[in-house]
Amino acid sequence: MYKHFLTSVLLVFFMLSCSKLSPFEGKMRECVQTSLSWRNDTTGIWETAGWWNSANVLTATIRYGAVTKDPAIPSVIEDVFEKARHYQVGVDSTGTPRYCDNFINDYYDDEGWWALAWIEASKLTGEKKYLDMAEIIFDDMTTGWSDACGGGIFWKKNPLHYKNSIANNLFSLTAIRLYKATQNPAYLDWFKKNVDWYMRTGMINTDIYQIEDGTKDDCTPNRNAHYTYNQGVAIAVLAEMYLHSYRMEFSAQILRNLLAAFGMSVLS
C-alpha cells in the first residue's frame, strides 16, 4: 500500500515537473516535496514536527494544493486523516501508552490546530467527513469553557488549567470558520461570546500592542511572555471580526496597531 501511494505521489510530481511552473509555484512544490519526505507513513505525522505542528504542516500542504491544484494532495490529506486519528501522544504515570482519538487530546489548543486543518481539507476536497471531524473536535473544545475569570476556555484538561490566548483565539477562529462552512448560527454565537470575553481580559496589551500569553491565578494577564503564534492567531481572529462587521471599528483599530508592531500598514 505504501509503495502504491508513494508511486502515485511521485508520478504526479513528475508530471508537474514536466509542465512549466512559475518560480513561485516551483518553490512551493520544492518545499512540499521536502516536507512530504519527512512524513511518517505509519503514523501519518511529520517527523520532528510533533503532534500539533503536524496539523500546521498539513494546513500548509492543503493551501499549496488549493493554489496549484496539485492532484496528489487529496491523497495525502486522506492518508493523514486515516492514520493520525488514533495516535500515541505519550505515556501516563504508570508508563501506559496514551492515545488521542479523532484528533482530541489533553490540550484544547492542539485540538484547534487540527480542527482548522480539517475545515481547510473539506473546503479543498468537498469531502464532508473532514468538516464532520472539525465539528467533533470543536464540540470537545466547548467542554473547556467555564465561568472562571468571566469565561473563556482552558488550555489544558485533566485537570483544567490556565486560560490563555492561543487556546481561546484558536477556539474563536474555529467557531467562525465552522460558521462560514455550515451557516450554523450556534458557531457564530460561540465566536461572539468568546471574543467578547477575550477582549475584556487584557491579554491584548494596548500599551505595546503585543498579545500576552495568558492569565494568572487572579485572572489578570501575565505580562512576561510574548510568542509570535499568539500574535498571528489573534490577528486572524480580528480579521474575521472585521470581515463579519462585528465590533468593526474596535477590531480595525486593534488590528491596525498589532500589524504596525510588525512594521505593516493596513486598513488606512
Regions found by a protein language model. Name each.
Residues 1-23:
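Bacterial Sec-dependent N-terminal signal peptides
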Residues 19-268:
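Glycan-recognition and catalytic cores of secretory/periplasmic carbohydrate-active enzymes
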